[in-house]
């Protein structure tokens, strides 16, 4: 299944509390013939709050955060799904431009029909160097 997901994003670092926030709102359009698919288009919104901790002489970092996720299918009479995603992002190399994110997505409602999901992502800030540089 292919989705087209345009979205608006906003982020802010709050120096007084040394935390960051990030928010998104968007629309997920499922590509293909509507009669051939078993999911509908949906609205989604996400908000994450976290803080980066620096350790050691060379500034290794760990970034724990919590994300709140909502999504609502269009065209179905189903309730909005709300989830919470505690997660952490850690650098994999010394240059810290390749990072691994790990989290678990827990449903806050409709949990009788929805299970928690383990999630992971790899982030490469290519401006700071090639993927295999800085290890």
Regions found by a protein language model. Name each.
Residues 1-4, 37-45, 78-84, 114-118:
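Residues that define the transmembrane beta-barrel architecture of outer-membrane proteins
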Residues 6-12, 27, 45-51, 86-90, ...:
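Residues on the lipid-exposed face of transmembrane beta-strands in outer-membrane beta-barrel proteins
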Residues 12-14, 25-31, 51-53, 68-74, ...:
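Transmembrane beta-strands of outer-membrane beta-barrel pores
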Residues 15-19, 53-62, 93-98, 128-135:
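Short loop/turn motifs that connect adjacent beta-strands in outer-membrane beta-barrel proteins
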Residues 19-25, 45, 62-66, 84, ...:
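Transmembrane beta-strands of outer-membrane beta-barrel proteins
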Residues 23-57, 61-63:
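A mid-sequence, solvent-exposed acidic-amphipathic segment
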Residues 56-62, 69-77, 86:
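Long, repeat-rich segments with strong aromatic
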Residues 115-135:
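Outer-membrane beta-barrel "beta-signal"
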